[in-house]
């Protein structure tokens, strides 16, 4: 597929959101927040025909949120670590994806020494079908963190987020005090900054964005070591946004730029650099 068509394919939701916000600025729209949530998350629900498709080596996990009115259930995948006492990673995926389409990256993380719990937020995969928001995905991330604490007490825990999941991970890291580290890949400083990085960024729509995911403001509050990874060929989230997020973080921290890494290939291409950074920043795999 030609490069310009690939760019349009992946950025079409962003273009649609820009167009909608511009129109709403003049016409007004009571469903503006709803439309933003649909376009930003692009939630992918699995049908009943998809259910029960076991993935070799991974176990299904179900987590209930009893505090929420509907008592929603989250589906997740658990991949045991290479050793019984391996550190545990909470894996938070990005927009459009679900845990089953993230298995390749989950396995990469195990190869780096982690046991991994990956969760689907409400509205994704087999989790309760509900339109996600910035607040509900945060609740879901906290539920996943609590599950790890309950099921694997005493083990070191790390938070990982890819793309939009990186913003969810940053927020979670500001709200828990028992993480050993925060790792984000292919992520950004804020949703407004993503739009401003595009050729249409001059449009005056920033005040209309309700799902802001302001990681740049939050990451300065993160007290654990931070690893920021980005591919230098990422055509969806510019590496400059990953670097800007890194610049806002406290020390100790590390920025890794993976040569030739795209938004989806960076994790695989950067395994050696990941190992080096994990050893230097967290003492893992030493």
Could you describe each region identified by the protein language model?
Residues 233-237, 263-265:
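Acidic catalytic loop of the alpha/beta-hydrolase fold
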Residues 105, 215, 224, 238-247, ...:
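Short alpha-helix in the alpha/beta-hydrolase fold that links the catalytic acid
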Residues 221-223, 228-230, 234:
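Short beta-strand/loop motif that positions the catalytic acidic residue
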Residues 24-66:
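An N-terminal hydrophobic leader/cap segment in hydrolases
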Residues 243-264:
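Catalytic histidine neighborhood in serine/cysteine hydrolases
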Residues 167-224, 268, 272:
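Hydrolase active-site cap/lid region
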Residues 68-147:
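Membrane-embedded segments
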Residues 152-163:
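Alpha/beta-hydrolase fold nucleophile elbow
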């Amino acid at each position: 597929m030609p490069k310009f068509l690939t760019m349009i394919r992946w950025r079409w939701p962003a273009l649609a959101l820009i167009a909608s916000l511009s129109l709403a600025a003049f016409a007004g729209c009571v469903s503006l927040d709803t439309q933003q949530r649909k376009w930003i998350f692009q939630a992918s629900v699995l049908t009943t025909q998809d259910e029960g498709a076991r993935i070799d080596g991974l176990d299904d996990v179900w987590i209930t949120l009893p505090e929420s009115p509907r008592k929603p259930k989250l589906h997740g995948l658990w991949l045991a670590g290479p050793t019984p006492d391996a550190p545990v990673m909470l894996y938070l995926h990005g927009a459009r994806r679900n845990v089953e389409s993230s298995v390749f990256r989950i396995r990469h993380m195990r190869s780096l020494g982690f046991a991994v719990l990956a969760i689907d937020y409400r509205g994704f995969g087999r989790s309760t079908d509900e339109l996600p928001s910035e607040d509900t995905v945060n609740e879901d991330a906290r539920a996943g963190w609590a599950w790890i604490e309950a099921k694997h007490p005493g083990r070191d825990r790390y938070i990982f987020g890819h793309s939009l999941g990186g913003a969810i991970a940053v927020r979670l890291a500001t709200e828990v005090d028992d993480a050993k580290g925060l790792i984000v890949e292919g992520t950004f400083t804020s949703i407004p900054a993503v739009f401003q990085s595009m050729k249409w960024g001059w449009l005056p729509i920033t005040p209309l964005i309700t799902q802001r995911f302001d990681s740049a403001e939050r990451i300065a509050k993160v007290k654990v070591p931070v690893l920021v990874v980005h591919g230098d060929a990422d055509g969806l989230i510019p590496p400059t946004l990953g670097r800007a997020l890194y610049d806002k973080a406290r020390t100790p921290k590390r920025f890794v730029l993976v040569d030739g890494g795209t938004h989806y290939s960076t994790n695989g291409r950067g395994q050696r650099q990941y190992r080096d950074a994990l050893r230097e920043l967290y003492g893992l795999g030493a």
